[in-house]
Amino acid sequence: MILLIDNYDSFTYNLAQYIGNFAEVQVLRNDDSKLYEEAEKADGLVFSPGPGWPVDAGKMEDMICDFAGKKPILGICLGHQAIAEVFGGKLGLAPKVMHGKQSNINFEAPSVLYQGIEDGHAVMRYHSILIEEMPEDFEVTARSTDDQAIMGIQHKNLPIYGFQYHPESIGTPDGLYSIRNFIEEVVK
């Protein structure tokens, strides 16, 4: 079972539908009293997009700290930013708001999440915050071709991954494959 932590975002159930193609999925809000109990039972954790700054998103950052190294973790948009922040990265406002904007990305490091996906593929972006400084134990897996923003990260030793873009959006045609790869190759 994959536990999808909902950061009060309208895309959460699109993401749940994608995950549900490959595994049982349970959705709980980021402030639900049962989060830790259900996370213990889960095979992997996915932190959804959401509004605002990661530090204000319920129990998300605490959960990332508590489950890092114990459960595979995937963060999307706000979840991606939270992973970076928890591990010592720095966030900042994007020079240009990227709500509903499509970019192409180039891979910078090999990642199991990009298996079967061509370099340069299109992704949909909905963010005004981004990673400015990477955490030491992480590597950049993808950058946007138009503004060189960090679009993908992974921990160097643990099964922890992040996407700044929205794989569940129709504007990310290959997004389903990344979700599949997380579940089939990482969570297993």
Q: Model regions: which residues?
A:
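Structural signature of beta-strand start/N-cap positions in the alpha/beta core
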Residues: M1, E24, D43-G44, P72-L74, ...
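Short amphipathic alpha-helix with an adjacent loop that forms part of the alpha/beta core around
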Residues: S33-A42
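Cysteine-nucleophile active-site neighborhood
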Residues: A42-S111, A122, I179-N181
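Short, charged N-terminal beta->alpha structural module
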Residues: I2-N21
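Catalytic beta-strand/loop cores that center a nucleophilic Ser/Cys/Thr
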Residues: S111-L158
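Active-site environment of divalent metal-dependent phosphoester hydrolases
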Residues: F11, L130-E132, I170-G171
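A short beta-strand-loop structural module common to alpha/beta enzyme folds
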Residues: E24-D32
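Acyltransferase
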Residues: S169-K188
